[in-house]
């Protein structure tokens, strides 16, 4: 590969596993013939950003510019770009490239491509490391750019590029999107609250399952869930046993799967999208005797992500956010670690991060 021309950029980076983010000047490649460049307006803070800045998964490369819930406005397109033009509202989620030829890619599931390149902290083809959306602009292959519906507010749409697709994809893929179905959503956090909104928009009956009675009013009266179960209440769980077609489990803390499997109907599906640090016990007998299934799911493919955001536009689905300035990001990370946010932090990049005068 020949020499790649570069363009100055500015963002916030973690320099070591302390996880503290500070101003960082770097370069991005010039706009290639199939690239879309856009000014970043907003970027959501995902819980995985917190893990990555502290190298808690053992895969971080420093300096690390996080952010994979990125939205903005197109400023330049390459000569062979056909889907986008300057001035349009776009976003980039967790992926910026994949091989394009493996079974996963040909099936539209680039998220499972063994050679997929994540939006930050991964080696790119030009021997650079990808930098994410805590920055003033992005450049990305056209095929990994998502069009944002005009009616959606960009700040509240940003988290959908991770949280939204994480809950939407398994519901669609596993057929848990049929009107009249009964769907359980475990956990009412960044993923769970969006899961409730999509499941309701699909026409399903939704029950929120939580350890805390305190979230009942929020779940039913504000988010529109049909029912609420306290997972620590044996009577509530017993009364609801065998009633659910599927459950989306968004919880990352260690918890028992047995009560959740009990809530499922014959052939019911429990989909894990949270990522507990320690292994969970899997009771096998409910799987054998009632053909219940447990599976996992990770974000979604690009076509599926576009479908998700289009559905969000149709039904006015957005994340519930707390908009913050760039200089508040380290405090936000501390609060996120304590689960002190309802439900997603979003950085006002364009108005609070030092601008790049060359844009």
From Swiss-Prot:
One MF annotation (Gene Ontology) recorded for this entry: zinc ion binding
Residues noted as binding Zn(2+) 2 in the record, renumbered to the chain: 99, 102, 105, 113
GO-annotated biological processes: lignin biosynthetic process; response to bacterium
Record-linked PROSITE patterns: ADH_ZINC (PS00059)
InterPro entries listed in its UniProt record: ADH-like_C, ADH-like_N, ADH_Zn_CS, CAD-like, GroES-like_sf, NAD(P)-bd_dom_sf, PKS_ER
Cofactor, free-text remark: Binds 2 Zn(2+) ions per subunit.
Keywords from the named record: Lignin biosynthesis, Metal-binding, NADP, Oxidoreductase, Zinc
Superkingdom of origin organism: Eukaryota
Catalytic activity: (E)-cinnamyl alcohol + NADP(+) = (E)-cinnamaldehyde + NADPH + H(+)
Enzyme Commission number(s) of this protein: 1.1.1.195
CDD domains reported in the protein's UniProt record: CAD1 (cd05283)
Any one annotated GO CC term: plasma membrane
Keyword NADP attributed: yes
Pathway participation: Aromatic compound metabolism; phenylpropanoid biosynthesis
Binding residues annotated for Zn(2+) 1, in chain numbering: 46, 68-69, 162
Tissue and organ expression note: Expressed in the differentiation and elongation zones of primary and lateral roots. Expressed in the hypocotyl, cotyledon veins, vasculature of the first rosette leaves, hydathodes and trichomes. In stems, expressed in the vascular cambium and developing xylem tissues. Expressed in the style, anthers, stamen filaments, stigmatic regions in flowers, and abscission and style regions of siliques.
Reported cofactor(s): Zn(2+)
Enzyme class label: oxidoreductase
The UniProt record lists the keyword GTP-binding: no
Ligand binding (NADP(+)): 48, 166, 187-192, 210-215, 250, 274, 297-299
UniProt function note: Involved in lignin biosynthesis. Catalyzes the final step specific for the production of lignin monomers. Catalyzes the NADPH-dependent reduction of coniferaldehyde, 5-hydroxyconiferaldehyde, sinapaldehyde, 4-coumaraldehyde and caffeyl aldehyde to their respective alcohols.
Oligomer and partners: Homodimer.
Family: Belongs to the zinc-containing alcohol dehydrogenase family.
Designated name of the protein: Cinnamyl alcohol dehydrogenase 8
Protein source organism: Arabidopsis thaliana
């Amino acid at each position: 590969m020949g020499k790649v021309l570069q363009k100055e950029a500015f963002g916030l980076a973690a320099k070591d596993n302390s996880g503290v983010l500070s101003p960082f000047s770097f370069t991005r490649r010039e706009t290639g013939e199939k690239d879309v460049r856009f000014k970043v307006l907003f970027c959501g803070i995902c819980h995985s950003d917190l893990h990555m800045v502290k190298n808690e998964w053992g895969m971080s490369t420093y300096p690390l510019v996080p952010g994979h819930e990125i939205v903005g406005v197109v400023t330049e397109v390459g000569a062979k770009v056909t889907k986008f033009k300057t001035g349009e509202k776009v976003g980039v989620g967790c992926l910026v490239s994949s091989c394009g030829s493996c079974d996963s890619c040909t099936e539209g599931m680039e998220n499972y491509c063994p050679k997929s390149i994540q939006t930050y902290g991964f080696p790119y083809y030009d021997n650079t490391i990808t930098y994410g959306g805590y920055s003033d602009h992005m450049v990305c292959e056209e095929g990994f750019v998502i069009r944002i519906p005009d009616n959606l507010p960009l700040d509240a749409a940003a988290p959908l590029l991770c949280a939204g697709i994480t809950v939407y994809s398994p519901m669609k893929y596993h057929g848990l999107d049929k009107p009249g179905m009964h769907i359980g959503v475990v956990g009412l956090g960044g993923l769970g609250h969006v899961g409730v909104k999509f499941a309701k928009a699909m026409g399903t009956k939704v029950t929120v399952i939580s350890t805390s009675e305190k979230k009942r009013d929020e779940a039913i009266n504000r988010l529109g869930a049909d029912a609420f179960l306290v997972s620590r209440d044996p009577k509530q769980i017993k009364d609801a046993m065998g009633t659910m077609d599927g459950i989306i489990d968004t919880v990352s803390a260690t918890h028992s799967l047995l009560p959740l499997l009990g809530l499922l109907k014959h052939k019911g599906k429990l989909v894990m999208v949270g990522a507990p640090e320690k292994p969970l016990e899997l009771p096998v007998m409910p799987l054998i005797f009632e053909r219940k299934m447990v599976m996992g799911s990770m974000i979604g493919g690009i076509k599926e992500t576009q479908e998700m955001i289009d559905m969000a536009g149709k039904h006015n689905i957005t994340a519930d956010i707390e908009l913050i300035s760039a200089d508040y990001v380290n405090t936000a990370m501390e609060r996120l670690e304590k689960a002190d946010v309802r439900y997603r932090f979003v950085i006002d990049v364009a108005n609070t991060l030092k601008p790049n005068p060359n844009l």
